[in-house]
């Protein structure tokens, strides 16, 4: 257990060090504003962590023979998530484990939800409504300005409406319900994380 904890700590430190070094060099070369350095470090760390997490999910999807539904899920989730924001765990390993466990749960429940589409549609409609009302959670690490937050909320509402239309179109075209369930669950998960961020006040007040 101790060895595992140390390994997790080393991973986080290594990711932060890579980000600090790279962004520091770009700041020295005047490619990045000094005032924006902290934000760029945060975004770069997010990119590395996302690469590790998404890579792991794709590998697991191959094991379950769910690669293509998973790709649809990831596209829907990542496109919406980067605009809505939402709850973040404070450590990468926690976020990573939560993501993997969440994906495994999705693999299990997607089969059940695809057999009961009325429940799936009711929940995704509620999720779309929630995102439409809230829009975006302004995470403390991003600390968006009022204009940036307004633009992000507008983008989130546009994307969730677009994704909702795609899901509806797939249903009308009688597409495989497994694919539909993965796309719908992506929207539902984004809405859930957005609501959790609001509940736990993990945001900068406007």
Please name every model-derived segment:
Residues 20-69, 79:
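Hydrophobic transmembrane alpha-helices
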Residues 61-73, 120-127:
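Structural signature of hydrophobic alpha-helical transmembrane segments
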Residues 77-88, 136-144, 198-199:
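C-terminal ends of transmembrane helices
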Residues 82-98, 104-105, 109:
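Interfacial aromatic-anchored transmembrane helix boundaries in multi-pass membrane proteins
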Residues 90-101, 119-125, 148-154:
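Cytoplasmic-side transmembrane-helix entry/capping segments in multi-pass membrane proteins
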Residues 99-141:
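Short helix-perturbing small/polar motifs within transmembrane alpha-helices
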Residues 106-119, 161-177:
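Hydrophobic alpha-helical transmembrane segments in multi-pass integral membrane proteins
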Residues 139-162:
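Membrane-helix boundary/juxtamembrane motif in polytopic membrane proteins
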